[in-house]
């Protein structure tokens, strides 16, 4: 797959790369990976297996460790909580019950607290996962494969704006991150000037990838 090849090449160039594949929610709600034989949301995340979740997430491009990061990183959790409050009028709480970590949510205006179940809240799980890895400084390069999945265009645009705030080359500015976005959504095409066209590759079936070279722009 293109995303895995890209991850390999970037790793060889000494970037600390995190891939979030198009199937990143697997392990939360699917059984397509042998280790995740049942939903990790219905019963919670086994606290004794946190390191295993992280390793599998890194290996397969899964977002399973997102809630673990939120549990371990108060600074990131505070950011996510503030955004959930502003965007969705909801709060999130990470509860430890019987050796398992269970994320639970509640509407700000009242109502009972509820768990994030495997067959619902797709958009909520996506935005929480994407933002968590965006804010996590463990990696300085992230590949987002189809970040638009389950996201309303409004939140696609919001997420792109969050990416813009920290996008750059970490080898030049240590607090920046390098981003690669594989997408079918026009809301993730970040074109503000003709020079920005240099940053876009267009993939075709049975044809070579096309892109605009710097010399092409200079001619115009």
Locate predicted features.
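A short linear hydrophobic-aromatic micro-motif
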Residues: 90-94
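Coupling/switch segment of ABC-type P-loop NTPase heads
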Residues: 2-88
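Switch/communication elements of ASCE P-loop NTPase nucleotide-binding domains
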Residues: 96-220
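A short, flexible N-terminal coil/short beta segment enriched in small residues
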Residues: 86-89, 181-183
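Short, well-ordered coil/turn elements that cap or connect secondary structure elements
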Residues: 12-14, 89, 174, 194-195
């Amino acid at each position: 797959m293109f995303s895995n090849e890209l991850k390999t090449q970037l790793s060889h160039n000494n970037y600390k790369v995190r891939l979030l594949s198009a199937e990143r929610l697997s392990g939360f709600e699917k059984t397509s990976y042998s280790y995740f034989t049942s939903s990790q949301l219905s019963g919670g995340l086994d606290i004794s297996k946190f390191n295993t979740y992280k390793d599998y997430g890194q290996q397969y491009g899964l977002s399973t460790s997102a809630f673990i990061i939120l549990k371990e990183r108060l600074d990131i959790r505070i950011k996510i909580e503030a955004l959930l409050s502003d965007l969705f009028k909801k709060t999130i709480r990470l509860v430890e019950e019987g050796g398992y970590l269970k994320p639970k949510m509640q509407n700000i205006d009242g109502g009972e607290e509820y768990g994030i179940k495997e067959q619902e809240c797709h958009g909520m799980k996506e935005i929480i996962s994407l933002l968590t890895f965006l804010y996590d400084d463990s990696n300085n390069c992230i590949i987002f494969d189809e970040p638009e999945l389950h996201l309303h265009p409004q939140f696609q645009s919001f997420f792109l704006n969050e990416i813009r705030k920290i996008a750059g080359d970490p080898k030049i500015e240590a607090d920046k991150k390098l981003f690669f976005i594989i997408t079918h959504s026009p809301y993730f095409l970040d074109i503000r000037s003709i020079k920005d066209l240099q940053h876009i590759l267009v993939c075709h079936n049975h044809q070579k990838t096309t892109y605009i070279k710097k010399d092409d722009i200079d001619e115009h």
